[in-house]
Amino acid sequence: MLERAALLHRLRLPAHSLPFIYNGALFGGAKRSFSATSKRCTYEEEKAVLDELKPQLTADDLKHSKLLRNIGVSAHIDSGKTTFTERVLYYTGRIKAIHEVRGRDSVGAKMDHMDLEREKGITIQSAATYCSWDKDQESYHFNLIDTPGHIDFTIEVERALRVLDGAVLVVCAVSGVQSQTVTVDRQMRRYNVPRVTFINKMDRMGADPFKAIQQINTKLRIPAAAVHVPIGSESDLCGVVDIINRVAIYNEGENGEVLRKGPVPEELQDLVEEKRLLLVETLADVDDEMAEIFLDEQEPTVQQIKDAIRRATIARKFTPVLMGSALANTGIQNVLDAIVDYLPEPSEVLNTALDVSNNETKVNLIPSSHHPFVGLAFKLEEGNYGQLTYIRVYQGKLKKGGYITNVRTGKKVKVSRLVRMHSNEMEDVNEIGAGEICATFGIDCSSGDTFTDGKLKYSMSSMYVPDAVISLSISPNSKDSATNFSKALNRFQKEDPTFRVRFDPESKQTIISGMGELHLEIYVERMRREYNVACTTGKPQVSYRESIQIPATFDYTHKKQSGGAGQYARVMGNLTPVANSSENTFTTAVVGGRIPDKYLAACAKGFEEVCEKGPLIGHKVLGINMLINDGAIHAVDSNELAFKTATTAAFVQSFMQAQPVVLEPIMTVTVTAPNEFQGNVITLLNKLQAVIQDTENGHDEFTMTSECSLNTMFGFATSLRASTQGKGEFSLEFKQYSPASPQLQKQLIEEYRKSKK
């Protein structure tokens, strides 16, 4: 036990204070920084509101909520998420046999139901299921969503975390925290999702769980501590020690379904006590009640430790770390117990909506089946019986045969069929209560739409949708396929907000955009398989941006006389660059009514339109503020069109005088390969003019992180395979836009000018 003086010195607090240590983290598209105080206050405010709402819940509501968990499984690619989920389904009795992701029986994992997923051994779409787990003489109901690990399918993680109350973060014991682990962590913070962490692949050579925990603390910047110690290492792994209860747990039976408990092996007793003390220390840093116990030099009880873990986990100040191996059928049942013990029930999570009928005032949703219905459509999918809409019920009940209203469109629709999903299978139900996840057919809506009973006009915030970073032209090989080609593109756009389609009037080509080469490759292949449309694709195109480097003023007059009423508009102001901004802003400072508000609104519209297609190379404009501070009107000839045209022309004129620059996407490239190929990978990255940021050397593999222009990355997968004998893998993630090289800028500008002639 730490001495009182040492603890106070470490916490740097007066004796009457209670400690609170939390490392703030960057999160969200705007990279806002959250301090420890603001994060803590946010949770305390949530807790206070939840306590106020609790009396509105009936005894049935509380019991229903207590036995319900909505959780997701997220991780870096190849960390074993789907294998983990397969074991969860097996141990909960949801499936009768275990099938591997790349199994020999050609069945594949249950949650990877698409043929492409089973062929490639990756998860492409998030898949939902439900199962039950018995603990402490209660049966707990889990709504479980398995999400992709590849960055190209990040929207699947976004929409899953948007509607979930908790998550299991799977980390590889060998590779530790990887690039997509950091991305998933950022997404969990964005939606305030607490998590328990499972260190998987403990049976692999080079497994080092305590190094992984250290990386969780430093790279993810969230306090973490082990609640398990492995029994045996690598291929000799046979179980784990529960350090809270000081008991050894062994998985036995053909598939690890039999749990045997016993005393802690003698050779592990010192390590168990060391890690138990570290767990209590870490909890004292983040939980007030545990800090008081610590400061009073008391030995915490098992229940006090568990309660502290639950409080700190739900408050998003801490993550308990469990260990095992999904492939070796070890440690999975312990994670199911941890989901019950440490992740929140729906009534412990504050969800809000905006009251559209009352100036979008924020209102708190009550997870009670006796209140008016409010639900969010978070995912669309084409099923055998039409469009399948996944809905999270936040308040009230959703009944088969009932009517619900789409708040965005105002349309009232009938719920003709209500189902619970089990991957690609479904089970019909008559009603779904508050806090649950279900799916329904026959509802015309978009992803992110809010539904109510019709009396309420509530709108819930949707998920974060990142910008596309890569585009390519696409056309059907046969004119006879044009109808199916159009159907496929419309469906894919509706299902996936990161998949965009546009028609380029200059080249007369259809352009598809997405999150990466694999993302678009999958959709082209799905079009061939699901719609029998073979396509030809052009060379991938990078989504560049345009900006300026210095301010510029404008004083532009638009005049047009054509015999009758003409057009007249004068606008004055300036353009200024906004550093590190992902948005454009339009502001006005016109005094004395020299430009009426209706004309200023037209100016704003002109600004928005010209920013969609910049004057330099025809790509979107980024990081510019346009200010209009003066102007003039004509009593007869001025109108909205004239001011819109004047604004567009003034923008183009001043933009070209403000040292315009082409920005290109810079990607974070993470390469993992056997150690003997490290020199080859460095040579390959140097050829791409990549800037190497970090290298981590493991027992057998190394992980190298670098930053590189997306423009140089096409074909990198082939080059990496050749350089590593097919043993290397990599991931790409968008980092930022930066000025392109002068040669590339000149080339792009010349190509654009030629295309305009």
Swiss-Prot record:
Q: Does the keyword GTP-binding apply?
A: yes
Gene Ontology biological-process entries: mitochondrial translational elongation
- Tell whether Transit peptide is among the UniProt keywords: yes
Q: What is this protein called?
A: Elongation factor G, mitochondrial
According to the UniProt entry, its GO molecular function terms are: GTP binding; GTPase activity; translation elongation factor activity
In terms of SUPFAM superfamilies, this protein maps to:
EF-G C-terminal domain-like (SSF54980), P-loop containing nucleoside triphosphate hydrolases (SSF52540), Ribosomal protein S5 domain 2-like (SSF54211), Translation proteins (SSF50447)
Q: Main role?
A: Mitochondrial GTPase that catalyzes the GTP-dependent ribosomal translocation step during translation elongation. During this step, the ribosome changes from the pre-translocational (PRE) to the post-translocational (POST) state as the newly formed A-site-bound peptidyl-tRNA and P-site-bound deacylated tRNA move to the P and E sites, respectively. Catalyzes the coordinated movement of the two tRNA molecules, the mRNA and conformational changes in the ribosome.
